[in-house]
Amino acid sequence: MDVERLQEALKDFEKRGKKEVCPVLDQFLCHVAKTGETMIQWSQFKGYFIFKLEKVMDDFRTSAPEPRGPPNPNVEYIPFDEMKERILKIVTGFNGIPFTIQRLCELLTDPRRNYTGTDKFLRGVEKNVMVVSCVCPSSEKNNSNSLNRMNGVMFPGNSPNYTDRSNINGPGTPRPLNRPKLSLSAPLTTNGLPESTDSKDSELQLSEEKGHSDSSASESEVSLLSPVKNKHPDEDAVESEEHEVKRLKFDKEGDVRETASQTVSGEVSSVRAEETETAAPPPDKDRESRTRQHCTEEEEEEEEEEEEEEEESFMTPREMVPERKNQEKESDDALTVNEETSEESHQMEGSGVSPAQTDSTSERSDSAGASRSGSDCLETQESGGPPSSKTGESVSVPSSMESEEATEVTDDPMEQD
């Protein structure tokens, strides 16, 4: 379609006093019905669109009159004239191209394709005109447009609040250009709520000091990491400022948490130390108790040793007394024998006694000593072992008696001679 030719045909249609169908404009409506592309603005072809819609509704009624039977009880019956006025009123109220323009053009170019009755046709047209969203013409999408539309409302292109931009949610939905910037004096928390006024002054100073040094670096990083956002530098600046404010707030919160944790840990450690001091006994008391136990153990060991020594002292004299007596008696016997032999030798020298007599006397003395020693041993066993002092006395007594007996024995041979 030639846009210039189309615009000339629209101008001629408006200049005519009597409205008639134009083949060029009908061809335009067929093109829109097939492709959905509107190459001109709504204000330019709005008049012809309304004329064509009214004419199609009238022709449909003449060709297919209303049914003679009773209306459907489940559907509200609306007269043709009332429905026609309602549809035309909605279409004239549009300030932009409705997003159902393609389906409306299909109904205008070929009304009997899907409908046979006038009532159903009017309800189908009403359903497609009762919309609020609008679309931009195809020429406005490719080139810069001076008009923007939102829900059928047109805004001038030089408005400072809006710019020409197609949105994901729908074409032609405007987007605000100059968003209100967040002041650094009132930053937002992570929940979106403003912080308390106490920390505003300190955050202002820190943000002003670090803002100048970090602004260039943050902008370069944002531009490198997100190249799509470069189309809106103002938005990037606002986002970078928000990131800086949040980073400063998080740093402060981290410092406050660290100090709080340190203080809490110090208090907990002090409380634990006090509890351990109160619960655990002092080391001096432990040492005293240990020394007392050691002393008692040593005393018990000493008492046991003393008892053992006393038992040994009681046992040894009884056991050793017979042996000592035997040794002392043997030594005394040997001494007495020696003395007797010496005396006999002297007497024999003086008296001239024969050696046979001396031998007999020595044998008698030996037998007498042996009998005496046997009697002494029996006496010691019967008495049960007297102490060492008594044994000494007993030993000394037999020695004197033996000496007397020896003298008597020596005197006997002299008397015999």
Curated annotation (Swiss-Prot):
Ranges of Acidic residues composition bias in the record? 297-313, 402-417
Q: What is its main location?
A: cytoplasm
A GO-annotated cellular component = nucleus
* Gene Ontology BP term (one): regulation of double-strand break repair via homologous recombination
Q: What Pfam family does this protein match (any one)?
A: PPP4R2
Compositionally skewed regions (Low complexity) per UniProt: 214-226, 367-376
Cite the record's Polar residues compositional bias ranges: 158-170, 186-196, 259-268, 378-392
Modified residue Phosphoserine is at which positions?
S159, S226
Q: Which GO terms describe its molecular function?
A: protein phosphatase regulator activity
What are the alphabetically sorted keywords of the record? Cytoplasm, Cytoskeleton, mRNA processing, mRNA splicing, Nucleus, Phosphoprotein
Extent of Basic and acidic residues compositional bias: 197-213, 243-258, 283-296, 320-329
Task: Please give the InterPro entries that the UniProt record associates with this protein.
Answer: PPP4R2
Subunit annotation = Serine/threonine-protein phosphatase 4 (PP4) occurs in different assemblies of the catalytic and one or more regulatory subunits. Component of the PP4 complexes PPP4C-PPP4R2, PPP4C-PPP4R2-PPP4R3A and PPP4C-PPP4R2-PPP4R3B. The PPP4C-PPP4R2 complex appears to be a tetramer composed of 2 molecules of PPP4C and 2 molecules of PPP4R2. Interacts with DDX20/GEMIN3 and GEMIN4. Interacts with RPA2; this DNA damage-dependent interaction recruits PPP4C leading to RPA2 dephosphorylation.
| Assigned protein family | Belongs to the PPP4R2 family.
What is the protein name given in its UniProt record? Answer: Serine/threonine-protein phosphatase 4 regulatory subunit 2
